Amino acid sequence: MRHSNSGKKLGRTPSHRKALFRNLAKALLTHGKIRTTEIKAKELRRVVEPLITLALRNDLHARRQAYSVLGSHQLVKRLFDEIGPAFVGVPGGYTRVVKLGQPRRGDCAPLAIIEFTRTVAASEAAAAPAEAE
């Protein structure tokens, strides 16, 4: 029986799933929006939205909890200094999943874009490689 077992397994082991969502969360916080499969995008909300709620608390314990998920001091700083203040006064729903019309070529997986509902300034780390090209 599947009582109280929420979340999709995505055909991965628990450690692989945890690493996948950590990496997707890092990419979303860095770039502001990412393209992935629809199911991964919907499950990613369960990781990212609590992180933004932590950023709204903005205390030392919240920073340490965010670091335990992200593992990067630069991303934690960006989360608390840039992304969090953009959502002050918003009671939830920090991300938006937009379904794309074309499925992924090869396996026909439905694709989606996950992005923040409020505009967050692009980080210098994400902008630097774009300028170098």
UniProtKB/Swiss-Prot annotation:
A GO cellular component entry from the record: cytosolic large ribosomal subunit
Signal peptide: none
Pfam families from the UniProt entry: Ribosomal_L17 (PF01196)
Gene Ontology annotations of biological process type: translation
Molecular function in Gene Ontology: structural constituent of ribosome
Classification via SUPFAM superfamilies: Prokaryotic ribosomal protein L17 (SSF64263)
InterPro entries the UniProt entry points to: Ribosomal_bL17, Ribosomal_bL17_sf
UniProt keywords, alphabetically: Ribonucleoprotein, Ribosomal protein
NCBIfam families attached to this UniProt entry: L17 (TIGR00059)
Binding partners and assembly: Part of the 50S ribosomal subunit. Contacts protein L32.
PANTHER family hit by this protein: LARGE RIBOSOMAL SUBUNIT PROTEIN BL17M, RIBOSOMAL PROTEIN L17
HAMAP family in alphabetical order: Ribosomal_bL17
Record-stated family: Belongs to the bacterial ribosomal protein bL17 family.
Name of this chain's protein: Large ribosomal subunit protein bL17
